[in-house]
């Protein structure tokens, strides 16, 4: 069965002085290969199978399997503390906003809409046949009137709720700008007739003052952004739309004398056509005017569907043939001020039908530069004048017709739809979605679940090795050796009664007189005689255990011959937690701790009183107790719970005795309960029963002792790391009965009189004494039962003694070095 069975002594333990100096049986730990044989070991011994790391506990003649050593897994559980970080995962809820970010992608399409403002170059109007240059006449009174004031830009209309973008429709006739607000009314623009042959230049009129540019209208508030509609598929290129409706023909101006044509200014708003001036003499051929610069092509916008072809404009009225004037002096070719660029938002009138070529007027002399009359809307092409000198070829300013690029403005209207696209930038909210990534951190919190794995570490009943702690009790004898140090004090008795002054001798430690105390060491001879007992008288000195000054008495450690349990104490013991005040408690596992040894008691049962004359009450029962129960612990974790209070003794007949309350210890998912003892009876002379414990071990705890019934209470029992409480003794007329015992602790005594029963003992204290005719019942201690009350107690007191309060003690150890 078990081979190479070795007795193990060197395990790290501490000699623990428990509240009442409990001396436990000398448990042993055996280590071998395979299951233990029933012939080895005694009750409460432990056996560890090296092959399987299983732990057995001997109970009676049987070895009970209690668990396995799994300490290593327990260390993995330490990581569970990181689980706290998981709380941040809640921030991840914001990540849902990321979906809105996709709408932002549509917004980028809207930016292309801005390019739409430039649009495709409007289809250039069909250039009319170049008319024969007429004879340059006197510059007519083609007064370029002051530029009409630019209509104020209408306030931008509130953007309507953006509807779902429909499929792109065909380009319709340019209409007034819709949702972007009503444009200010523009002066009537004459429809542009087809370019005819250039008539004689009239006298250059004085350049009219530049019209005041209207103030831009207030921008309307943006409307509520509608959801972006589905982008329509790009339509097929439609057939070229008809020219737009012909604009209203401006009033025909009088023909002015042809002057030298000045450089074409930028095309301004077309004014009223001036009247033809009298034909002047044909002037000298003017220098060929500088061709106007070709306007730069606008950025190519997304090609929109071609609009429906506008109706062909009516043919312009053929202009009257101008009289050929004398060639005027060459007019100043000063380039006119650049006219304000026409508002591109307005619909361009369709190009009128090509007018008949006007007759060339006779070239008259260049007249004085006339005042620039208001530029009338381009009138009907006059009759083709006589062919003038080639030089009369006007500046290609007619190319100013390229101002038709203003049609791009029409495309702009389309482009403004692109502005709606800007709202798509709202998709930036999608960036918030990135903060949603923080939610991933929340996933880290799952690691906290590993902390549960740490509970597996609790299985690491490796601490069971702590049974050697029982052995440590032997070390308690070493504590008795401390009494031996008192014997050293007894050595000072060699000096006689002055030994009491030995307290002042402590002062002598500061003085050289303390050296005389060294002579006291010779008093070790006192070990031989009962002089040491006199040292017990020195217990008075205990009052001033200053005798501890005789720490030199540590020499008495020699009495610790069996102090093998002390080995490793200084190396592995960290600290102890102890509380005996009833109520809640919290103990935090210190740094470095790996093992904890739990000792605890519940509240003892209260002693019974009397109800009828000549009767006394039974003693209360003792509580269940834990003793050095080993646990695997983790630094920073906590033991919490409640310490039980002793039950109240009975008071006369009005209030019966009560049961002691339980002591509850919680650690992680584990719960340990030391149940309180039962109260003594006040009516039937019965003692209260002792109680037991509840713990998460695969064994049944020993039952509590039974209260006496005209007998002494029965003793408590023991099981793995626990003791049950003893029963209280019964009361009697001629003599009461004693409470039961637990280990070295005895039940409360009674007396051969009408007396209450003695309280049952606990594993840590004696039971309370029963009351009689000369003494009152006493309280129990450390979970033992209170004594029963008696009718004939002094002053007529009949109260039973209270049960002893419980306590909790936890000793923490590190890994042995």
UniProtKB/Swiss-Prot annotation:
Gly residues composition-biased segments: 757-771
Q: What is its main location?
A: virion
- Enumerate the residue ranges of region (Disordered): 87-107, 120-458, 479-543, 757-804
| Localization annotation | Virion
Is Glycoprotein tagged as a keyword?
yes
Residues annotated as domain Collagen-like: 83-142, 145-264, 268-327, 352-411, 430-489, 512-570
Q: InterPro entries annotated for this entry?
A: Collagen, Collagen_Structural_Proteins, Gly_rich_dom
Its GO CC terms?
Answer: virion component
Keyword Ubl conjugation annotated: no
Alphabetical keyword list: Collagen, Glycoprotein, Hydroxylation, Repeat, Virion
Q: In which residue ranges is the amino acid composition biased (Basic and acidic residues)?
A: 126-141, 149-161, 212-224, 233-245, 294-341, 354-368, 377-390, 428-458, 495-504, 515-525, 533-543
| Changes after translation | May be hydroxylated on lysine by the viral-encoded procollagen-lysine,2-oxoglutarate 5-dioxygenase.
Which stretches does UniProt call biased (Low complexity)?
246-260, 480-494
Glycosylation-annotated residues: 106, 121, 183, 345, 360, 483, 709, 712, 715, 772
Role of this protein: May participate in the formation of a layer of cross-linked glycosylated fibrils at the viral surface thus giving it a hairy-like appearance.
Q: Which PANTHER family match?
A: COLLAGEN ALPHA-1(XXV) CHAIN, SI:CH211-266K2.1
Name-wise, this protein is Collagen-like protein 4
């Amino acid at each position: 069965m078990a081979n190479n069975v070795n007795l193990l002594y060197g395990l790290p333990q501490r000699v623990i002085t428990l509240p009442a100096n409990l001396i436990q049986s000398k448990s042993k730990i055996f280590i071998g290969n395979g299951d233990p044989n029933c012939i080895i070991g005694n009750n409460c011994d432990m056996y560890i199978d090296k092959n399987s790391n299983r732990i057995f506990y001997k109970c009676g003649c049987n070895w009970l399997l209690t668990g396995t050593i799994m300490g290593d897994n327990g260390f993995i559980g330490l990581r569970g503390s990181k689980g706290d970080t998981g709380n941040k995962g809640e921030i991840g809820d914001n990540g849902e906003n990321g979906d809105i970010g996709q709408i932002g992608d549509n917004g980028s399409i809207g930016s292309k809409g801005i390019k739409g403002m430039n649009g495709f170059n409007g289809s250039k109007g069909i250039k009319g046949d170049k008319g024969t240059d007429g004879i340059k006449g006197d510059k007519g009174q083609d007064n370029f009137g002051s530029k009409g004031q630019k209509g104020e830009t209408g306030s931008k209309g509130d953007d309507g709720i953006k509807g779902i973008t429909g499929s792109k429709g065909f380009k319709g006739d340019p209409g007034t700008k819709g949702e972007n607000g009503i444009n200010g009314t523009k002066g009537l623009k004459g429809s542009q007739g087809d370019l005819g042959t250039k008539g004689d230049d009239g006298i250059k009129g004085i350049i009219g003052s530049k019209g005041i540019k209207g103030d831009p209208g207030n921008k309307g508030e943006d409307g509520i952004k509608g959801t972006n509609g589905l982008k329509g598929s790009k339509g097929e290129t439609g057939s070229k739309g008809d020219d737009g409706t012909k604009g209203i023909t401006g009033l025909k101006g009088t023909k002015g004398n042809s002057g030298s044509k000045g450089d074409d200014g930028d095309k301004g708003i077309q004014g009223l056509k001036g009247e033809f001036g009298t034909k002047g003499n044909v002037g000298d051929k003017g220098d060929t005017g500088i061709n106007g610069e070709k306007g730069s092509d606008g950025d190519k916008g997304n090609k929109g569907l071609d609009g429906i072809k506008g109706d062909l404009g009516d043919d312009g009225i053929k202009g009257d043939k101008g009289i050929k004037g004398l060639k005027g002096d060459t007019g100043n070719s000063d380039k006119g001020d650049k006219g304000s660029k026409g508002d591109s938002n307005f619909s361009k009138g369709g190009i009128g039908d090509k007018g008949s070529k006007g007759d060339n007027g006779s070239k008259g002399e260049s007249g004085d530069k006339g005042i620039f009359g208001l530029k009338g809307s381009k009138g009907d092409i006059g009759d083709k004048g006589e062919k003038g000198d080639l030089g009369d070829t006007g500046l290609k300013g007619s190319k100013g017709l390229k101002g038709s690029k203003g049609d791009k403005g029409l495309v702009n209207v389309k482009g403004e739809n692109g502005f709606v696209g800007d709202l798509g930038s709202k998709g930036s909210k999608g960036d918030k979605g990135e903060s949603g990534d923080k939610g991933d951190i929340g996933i880290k919190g799952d690691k906290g679940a590993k902390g549960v794995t740490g509970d597996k570490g609790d299985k690491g009943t490796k601490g069971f090795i702590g049974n050697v702690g029982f052995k440590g009790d032997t070390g308690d004898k070493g504590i008795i050796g401390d009494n031996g140090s008192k014997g050293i004090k007894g050595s000072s008795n060699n000096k006689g009664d002055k030994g009491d002054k030995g307290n002042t001798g402590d002062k002598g430690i500061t003085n050289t007189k303390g050296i005389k105390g060294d002579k006291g060491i010779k008093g070790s001879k006192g070990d031989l005689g009962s002089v040491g007992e006199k040292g017990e008288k020195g217990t008075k000195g205990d009052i001033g255990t200053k005798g501890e000054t005789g720490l030199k008495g540590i020499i008495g450690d020699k009495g610790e011959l069996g102090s093998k349990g002390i080995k490793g104490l200084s190396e592995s013991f960290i600290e102890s937690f102890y509380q005996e005040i009833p109520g809640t408690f919290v103990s935090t596992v210190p740094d470095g701790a790996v093992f904890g040894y739990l000792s605890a008691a519940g509240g003892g049962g209260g002693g019974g009183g009397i109800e009828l004359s000549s009767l006394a009450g039974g003693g209360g029962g003792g509580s269940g107790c834990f003793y050095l129960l080993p646990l695997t612990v983790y630094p920073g974790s906590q033991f919490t719970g409640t310490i039980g209070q002793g039950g109240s003794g009975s008071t006369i007949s009005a209030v019966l005795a009560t049961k002691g309350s339980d002591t509850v210890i919680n650690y992680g998912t584990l719960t340990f309960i030391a149940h309180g003892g039962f109260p003594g009876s006040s009516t039937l002379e019965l003692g209260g029963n002792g109680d037991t414990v509840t713990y998460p071990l695969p064994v049944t705890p020993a039952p509590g002792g039974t209260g006496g019934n005209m007998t002494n209470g029965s003793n408590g029992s023991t099981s793995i790391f626990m003791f049950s409480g003893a029963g209280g003794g019964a009361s009697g007329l001629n003599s009461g009965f004693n409470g039961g015992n637990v280990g070295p602790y005895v039940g409360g005594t009674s007396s051969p009189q009408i007396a209450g029963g003695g309280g049952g003992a606990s594993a840590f204290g004696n039971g309370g004494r029963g009351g009689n005719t000369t003494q009152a019942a006493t309280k129990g201690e450390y979970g033992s039962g209170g004594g029963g009350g008696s009718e004939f107690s002094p002053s007529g007191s009949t109260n039973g003694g209270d049960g002893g309060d419980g306590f909790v003690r936890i000793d923490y150890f590190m890994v042995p070095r």
